Amino acid sequence: MSDKVIVTCALTGAQQGKEANPNLPEQPREIIEQALDAARAGAAIVHIHARDSRGKATADVAVFREIAEGIRAKSDVILNLSTGGAVAGLPLEERLRVLPELKPEIASFSIGSGSLLGRYDAAGRKWLRDQYVPLVPSYAEMETAARIFRDNGVRPELEIYGTSFLNNVWHLREAGVLEEPLLINLVMNIPGECIPWSPKNVLFFVESLPPNNRWVVTAIGGKVHFLSVALSVAMGGHVRVGMEDNVYIERGVLARSNAQIVEKAVGILHAVGREIASPAEARQILGLRARV
């Protein structure tokens, strides 16, 4: 267990938008501003998706570049860029273009197949069950992607949505294409082919991971979001919060910003006697190269 806890803030995601919470950032200027505020509130890492001018998910490197450069100019917070983005049908090489083009320290890497339900209808309080986000990497694609990460000096954050993904972590590790310590994100509570959040499920997944790892839980939804903070830190993990995963600060009350959510998470950590890691300390914990 690390002495200090890394807080990741997932700023915007690729699914719900301002229809779910008008304070959710969509455009580059909004994302940059909220990233900087989240870093000041205690986030050592910001996880970033890009949106086009209509608020739809995009893998456009130019949009990612605008966001990344705007943050890097004012903060040493660690950037974790999405390579998924819910851009259906986009070829692997297009999704991975941010790696050689922008050289983020971390980027997300989905290592399994399945379908996740799409946008949330806030007015109707229901998920639109006819919209799917397919995750269909083959073993060959996963190994190719892992090598692209490695060759560009980008640490993959391995996204685990279900039990079959665990086998893929072990496979890629044994294939020698992953750098350690492994960065693991246990994604829970997304409707579709995704594991529900519960203490028992978190325990099972954590105990099933290869050794020498650093893990967080993505706990979707206001009912479990902050419970997950307390559970994860008690089990030796790190913490992920933010408006990608939860748009509420408390039951029925929309969050004003990502920074407000980070502040609440930091308060939980301090209440149980844990300190938060700075970006520099997070780099040491994760085995990342120092930023120059």
Protein language model features and the residues they cover:
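C-terminal helical cap(s) of enzyme catalytic domains, especially alpha/beta-barrels
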Residues: 117, 121-128, 250-274
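Conserved, mostly hydrophobic/aromatic
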Residues: 31, 38, 49, 107, ...
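Alpha-helix-loop-beta-strand connector modules within alpha/beta enzyme cores
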Residues: 9, 56-83, 145-149, 204-212, ...
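Glycine-rich, proline-tolerant flexible connector loops at the mouths of alpha/beta enzymes
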Residues: 19, 44-66, 187-190, 247-251
